[in-house]
């Protein structure tokens, strides 16, 4: 079980870190997220770059699904701007634990 609590917009709060350049839609400004799961790392703050597509990335990886074209395009746009692809939430999880 995994519950991700987040929201889509920053609500007008100023952020001192500029969002990375990618395609015309994002990723946008940083927003907080909380991961609730028995597989979540305890007392862990993940500093990886995520966006709303990270939830789709996690589902794709977890269930070994084909990568959606939009995710591939976003990754290519980030790479073209010298950035790494966005995370898939697995950095905050201990998936090898049963």
Regions found by a protein language model. Give the residues of each.
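N-terminal pro-sequences and low-complexity stem/linker regions of secreted or lumenal proteins
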Residues: 1-98
């Amino acid at each position: 079980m995994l519950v991700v609590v987040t929201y889509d917009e920053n609500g007008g709060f100023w952020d001192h870190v500029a969002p990375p350049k990618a395609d015309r839609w994002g990723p946008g400004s940083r927003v907080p997220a909380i991961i609730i799961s028995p597989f979540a790392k305890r007392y862990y703050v993940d500093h990886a770059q995520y966006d709303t597509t990270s939830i789709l990335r996690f589902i794709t990886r977890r269930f070994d699904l084909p990568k959606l074209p939009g995710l591939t395009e976003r990754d290519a746009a980030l790479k073209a701007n010298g950035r790494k692809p966005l995370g898939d939430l697995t950095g905050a999880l201990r998936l090898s634990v049963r």
